[in-house]
Amino acid sequence: MEKLIKDGEELNRTLDRMAHEILEKHEIDNTLALVGIRTRGIYIARRLMEKIKKITGKDVLYGELDITLYRDDLSQVAEQPVLKATNIPFDITGKTIILTDDVLYTGRTIRSALAALSDFGRPSRIELAVIVDRGHRELPIKADYVGKNLPTAKTEIVHIKLKEYDGEDSITLLVKNND
């Protein structure tokens, strides 16, 4: 059974709020950057970047991070993993980086992203923005900006659909029946 958590309009309002939360903590200058974790994290970062520009009139640095080779579960993901480009067209040293992803679960994706990011320099600070924090952490990782805290059972699946990738915007929870 699939349960709708947020529709497209609600997801857009969530991203508006997150953009305002980022602006409450940061000046928009060349020391702040949004870096999206592939795949859906890049679209979230782009949307936050656009919303911040609409509010402030200022551009935010933007990058895309592929963590495939940094995953500790690489052999479980695919026999032949598909690598996508990492595109961080600026020096991250001394910058505040806001990593963006769709769902925060065990923390392992973020651990991999931190390892990958360290190959590009030494930021002064790294923060985390996620659309959904579903709990069940296996590592001591906490998001700085959260669209929705959604306590789940480990057997449930959170689906975030973004129109750039999935053709529509929504957050749904797949609840498995105990039949």
Swiss-Prot record:
Its EC number is 2.4.2.9. Coiled coil: none annotated. CDD domains: PRTases_typeI (cd06223). A motif (PRPP-binding) lies at residues 97-109. Gene3D superfamilies: 3.40.50.2020. Keywords: Glycosyltransferase, Transcription, Transcription regulation, Transferase. Pfam families: Pribosyltran. Disulfide bonds: none annotated. GO terms for biological process: regulation of DNA-templated transcription. The keyword Heme does not apply. The keyword Transferase applies. One of its GO terms (molecular function) is uracil phosphoribosyltransferase activity. Belongs to the purine/pyrimidine phosphoribosyltransferase family. PyrR subfamily. Regulates the transcription of the pyrimidine nucleotide (pyr) operon in response to exogenous pyrimidines. Also displays a weak uracil phosphoribosyltransferase activity which is not physiologically significant. This is Bifunctional protein PyrR. It comes from Elusimicrobium minutum (strain Pei191).
